[in-house]
Amino acid sequence: LEDNLARIGKVKPETILPPIHGLPWGYRQRARLSVRHVLKKGKTLVGFREKRGSYVADMSRCEILPPKISGLIPLLAQMIDGLSIREHLPQIEVACGDNVDVLVLRVMEPPTAGDEAALRAFADAHGIQFWLQPKGLDSIYPFHPLDAPALTYTLPEFAVEMPFAPTEFTQVNSALNRVMVHRAIRLLDPQPGERIADFFCGLGN
């Protein structure tokens, strides 16, 4: 970065702040998992796509996801394997808030009554909320449970609570986001009556 500032911008920073750090594991609140039923393996896989390929990695966990979501990967694969639409469910969008975890299922075909019953049972058993996406991003809707709390992330230091939809952009690392906001506010040193808004990171802070 310093080289680029000097070479491109012809400037040299007066002060370089120390980098901020977060937990190395279990930090990612957002993810997109691929789903594929593999006949040769005789099962359905839920995971990330392999590098430079269209194959879905055979995963039993993901250490950068919250432990609860990581632990659900094999259970999701097993549940989806029993659905009639298992070959028409290509991806799962993960969105974790401070008070609810949402999984958005991309469903290319409508689920049957049996599929819906299986999804409800899974959501109830594991304390998550399913949303369904039959078409484009504007087609998503909450499926079960309908009385789940809204997705939000909070900045307790500033008494800020931000609601968001599962497909809206938020920082994937909420803990590090709080640290960044704290540092920014400290550097800006707002005075009484002044307001600060962050218009860069999606919904802002």
Label the predicted regions.
Residues 1-205:
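Accessory RNA-recognition modules of RNA-modification enzymes
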